[in-house]
């Protein structure tokens, strides 16, 4: 714990918290200080100009990151018949119906995301108290309740991330790993920013993209100068 504290102090000494850094400079700082022995994730926080307490200003959706996330995503699918076969062909790790539901109820959940065909929601709906708190309950707003389960599986495997404003109106997402090139991380961040911009609520007033910050798994955040994000 002492080593972590020392590293964080050294990082904070290099970063001016009142300053917004050009993307390349911010990323260089973050990578320099991401000295953990594992391949740390690169995370982004985006402060949106919304009132998250109002249901019509909750920003929620998903986006496929062009360079992926660097994570091997395990996908479970609720489907039957032809759709089940399509899900398997697309790379789903687990496909089932009542059997999958019973496995989940028993606490057996070796997967990261759950996708469901609309006609299976009578079964999936009984799992809300289990999947909901884990952020895995299928929802049409993020594309995990869909008749096209094959495409949903492919998107999940390709590096799709889901996003939703927290109570403070902030979006948190992982855009890659320390080992990614700067270009890959920037392309992923731009894809997320583009998706958030398109998802702007009609009732949102004033500046929408208020603040963008990057950090590594074990590091502090660095604010980004948004004018340096132009593709």
Curated annotation (Swiss-Prot):
UniProt xrefs under Gene3D superfamilies: 3.30.190.20, 3.40.50.790
A Pfam family recorded for this sequence: Ribosomal_L1
GO cellular component terms, A-Z: cytosolic large ribosomal subunit
Gene Ontology MF term list: rRNA binding; structural constituent of ribosome; tRNA binding
Residues in coiled coil: none
PANTHER family: 54S RIBOSOMAL PROTEIN L1, MITOCHONDRIAL, LARGE RIBOSOMAL SUBUNIT PROTEIN UL1M
Family to which this protein belongs: Belongs to the universal ribosomal protein uL1 family.
UniProt-recorded name of the protein: Large ribosomal subunit protein uL1
Organism ancestry: Bacteria, Pseudomonadati, Pseudomonadota, Betaproteobacteria, Burkholderiales
Gene name of the encoded protein: rplA
